[in-house]
């Protein structure tokens, strides 16, 4: 059976940053890219808030850069999906989807989190072309334009108020006849003049053409449908961490995110570390994920030094 010092699962900013640091520490990391090579960023058309790219860069191009850097220092990047981790003893036995098994002295989980979508075909069609699940990431591109936010909780209200500072008009599409957000967030929304809350509305279809989103068709709870022209459509109905692999093996919080020891990447299982959105329900930013990937690699290196 193949044996490795450090196995990294996930190929977003957290995974590849962990790989860069682990490789430079002579841990000869093996990284499995998973179901979505490059992570969520590959669906982002333009990134302007990651340090080092003053002119901006596409998500795919940035992830290609990170991948090349990790490979340059000796990371073994592999295509494949990890199907199981036996955490009962160390080295951990990790099973790949092709049936191969690997013994890993340390494992870094960087499998990310996925935004929840409505499930509309048109929504997926325009993903990255006007449909987004991150106002902080993409709102800047819709300055002085009309946009919509779907959701009724704190996140949706935060996204709407943020977009209102950039956009001409923000429509907050709420399925229920009330907001679920905190009182303070509700007041902020209702006191922002360019936010219009559309209660008891559902999204029937995202409209667009070859250039991207052009509008949305809404359906009231009474069945009436109508269209609104807009340029951006933001989902704020939550995220779910990609933790199916470690459910029942690592401590997870009530939302399913991996619990780490404060200030570290250490999980409830010695020798397994977590980085990026899989353990971060709050920030979900590429730069934060990259930083946590660095922390995970350093923690793994120190763990190996202490367990020689």
Q: Residue spans of the language-model regions?
A:
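Phosphate-coordination loops involved in phosphoryl transfer and adenosine-cofactor binding
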Residues: 3-5, 79, 143-145, 200, ...
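FAD-site-proximal beta/loop scaffold in flavoenzymes
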Residues: 119, 124-141, 237-283, 292, ...
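An active-site-proximal "capping" alpha-helix that borders the catalytic cofactor pocket
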Residues: 288-304
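Residue-level detector of alpha-helix initiation sites
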Residues: 12-13, 36, 113-115, 154-155, ...
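Beta1-alpha1 glycine-rich phosphate/pyrophosphate-binding loop at the start
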Residues: 4-73, 145-146, 157-183, 190, ...
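A Rossmann-like FAD-binding core segment of flavoenzymes
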Residues: 70-89, 93-96, 101-104, 165-262, ...
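Glycine/small-residue-rich loop that forms an oxyanion/phosphate-binding "nest" at active or ligand-binding sites
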Residues: 77-143
């Amino acid at each position: 059976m193949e044996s490795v010092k450090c196995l990294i699962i996930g190929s977003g900013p957290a995974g590849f940053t962990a790989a860069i640091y682990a490789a430079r520490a002579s841990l000869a990391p093996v990284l499995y890219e998973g179901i979505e090579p490059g992570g969520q960023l590959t669906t982002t058309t333009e990134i302007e808030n990651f340090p080092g790219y003053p002119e901006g860069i596409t998500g795919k191009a940035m992830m290609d850069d990170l991948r090349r850097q990790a490979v340059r220092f000796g990371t073994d990047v592999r295509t494949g999906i990890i199907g199981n981790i036996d955490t009962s003893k160390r080295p951990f036995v990790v099973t790949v989807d092709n049936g191969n098994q690997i013994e890993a002295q340390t494992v870094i989980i960087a499998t990310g989190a996925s935004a929840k979508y409505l499930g509309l075909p048109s929504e997926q069609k325009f993903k990255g072309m006007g449909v987004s699940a991150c106002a902080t990431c993409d709102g800047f591109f819709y300055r002085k334009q009309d946009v919509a936010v779907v959701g009724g909780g704190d996140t949706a209200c935060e996204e709407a108020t943020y977009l209102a500072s950039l956009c001409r008009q923000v429509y907050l599409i709420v399925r229920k006849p009330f907001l679920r957000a905190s009182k303070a967030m509700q007041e902020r929304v209702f006191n922002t003049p360019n936010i219009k809350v559309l209660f008891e509305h559902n999204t029937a279809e995202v409209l667009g053409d070859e250039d991207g989103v052009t509008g949305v068709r809404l359906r009231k709870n009474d069945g009436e449908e109508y269209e609104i022209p807009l340029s951006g459509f933001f989902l704020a109905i939550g995220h779910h961490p990609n933790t199916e692999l470690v459910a029942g093996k690592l401590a997870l919080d009530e939302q399913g995110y991996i619990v780490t020891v404060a200030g570290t990447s250490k999980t409830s299982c010695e020798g397994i570390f977590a980085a990026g959105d899989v353990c971060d329900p709050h920030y979900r930013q590429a730069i934060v994920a990259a930083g946590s990937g660095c922390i995970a690699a350093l923690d793994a290196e120190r763990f190996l030094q202490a367990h020689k």
